Amino acid sequence: MAHPVQLGLQDATSPVMEELITFHDHALMAMSLISLLVLYALFSTLTTKLTNTNITDAQEMEIIWTILPAIILVLIALPSLRILYLTDEVNNPSFTIKSIGHQWYWTYEYTDYGGLIFNSYMLPPLFLNPGDLRLLEVDNRVVLPIEAPVRMMITSQDVLHSWTIPTLGLKTDAVPGRLNQTVFTATRPGVYYGQCSEICGANHSFMPIVAELIPLKIFEMGPVFTL
């Protein structure tokens, strides 16, 4: 999860998030090199006194500063397209869980476990225990297995929401009347936090998401939910 004064991304808990972090570093390096080059050119222009009134054109330079940015954009676009494909790929998920957004809570439905349905509300500050996170804890966590592809079917009952867990690299819109899906494979057990990432009304800031990831063998023993 995030930490105070954290500057980077959260630690990855899925292969897709690992790819996103790698792409972030790749794009940031390209941006840094371009910025340094532009700053060097500006500094040289401001400090030099040399002029040449005989130069009317420089076709070689024009070709270079046209082709070079195009190459840089291609090098950035190719890994971006690959990650975009990975996020949309659905390949034989082991479990399907449905998430329904409401104003302002989430409903989860485990279709593979007899249609188990429960709501997940944010815990008010009066019900928090020492060490709990304000505005992030819920009464019922969504329990998910690790090391198995899980498909999340996401929709909304009223307005536009967005189901997001940054450490898993997940952000899928919950659209009324439409069923969106995303597939992920978690790699580490733990408790991970997210929030609705689409402004959905007065209490938009008070509908957190808490995913508890447990080993697959424990998950397969049956529902382990505390309701």
From Swiss-Prot:
The chain crosses the membrane at residues 15-45, 60-87. GO terms for biological process: ATP synthesis coupled electron transport. Its EC number is 7.1.1.9. Cu cation A1 binds at residues 161, 196, 200, 207. It is a multi-pass membrane protein. The keyword Oxidoreductase does not apply. Mg(2+) binds at residue 198. It is found in: Mitochondrion inner membrane. Binds a dinuclear copper A center per subunit. Gene3D superfamilies: 1.10.287.90, Cupredoxins - blue copper proteins. GO terms for cellular component: mitochondrial inner membrane; mitochondrion; respiratory chain complex IV. Residues 1-14, 88-227 are mitochondrial intermembrane. Its cofactor is Cu cation. InterPro entries: CcO_II, CcO_II-like_C, CcO_II_C, Copper_CuA, Cupredoxin, Cyt_c_oxidase_su2, Cyt_c_oxidase_su2_TM_dom, Cyt_c_oxidase_su2_TM_sf. Belongs to the cytochrome c oxidase subunit 2 family. This is Cytochrome c oxidase subunit 2. It comes from Cercocebus galeritus (Tana river mangabey). The gene is MT-CO2.
